[in-house]
């Protein structure tokens, strides 16, 4: 094995061991599916999440094919699909969907359903709480828009 792979394996093992030392706080999660992970789907992760499909509330860097969160979450998510109830931070993916977003979504399709502050950059950007096209500019642009869209709290 080369040095980089050995270092990565060591870091993952150290994170797993350390995460069990702090009661109530988990710094690392590895997940194949919400029911098949190191930690229960209701356990908050504060650190790093690596997933095929993960669904934990988190304040972390989430890297996976599908990153889902229930409840309040924050951080940076890199995935093919990112979805959340309430998210504060950055979402990078093909499809990003958040019920309440306070942050930025970068992706082909971005959806932010709530009335929070959010910026979107992508092919199709949807913010249904923006009721009319350019009626409240510069605080909001449109219900849907190509290239970019946003909503700023008043």
What are these regions (language model features)?
Residues 12-15:
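Repetitive helical segments and hydrophobic/amphipathic motifs
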């Amino acid at each position: 094995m080369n040095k980089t792979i050995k270092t990565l394996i060591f870091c993952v093992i150290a994170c797993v061991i350390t995460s069990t030392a702090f009661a109530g706080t988990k710094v690392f999660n590895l997940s194949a599916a919400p029911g098949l992970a190191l930690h229960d789907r209701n356990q908050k992760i504060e650190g790093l999440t690596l997933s095929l499909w993960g669904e934990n509330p988190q304040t972390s860097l989430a890297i996976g094919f599908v990153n889902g969160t229930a409840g309040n979450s924050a951080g940076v998510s890199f995935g093919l699909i990112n979805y959340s109830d309430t998210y504060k931070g950055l979402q990078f993916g093909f499809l990003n969907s958040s019920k309440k977003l306070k942050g930025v979504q970068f992706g082909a399709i971005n959806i932010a359903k709530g009335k929070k502050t959010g910026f979107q950059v992508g092919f199709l950007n949807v913010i249904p709480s923006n009721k009319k096209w350019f009626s409240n500019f510069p605080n909001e642009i449109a219900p849907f828009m190509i290239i970019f869209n946003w909503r700023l709290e008043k």
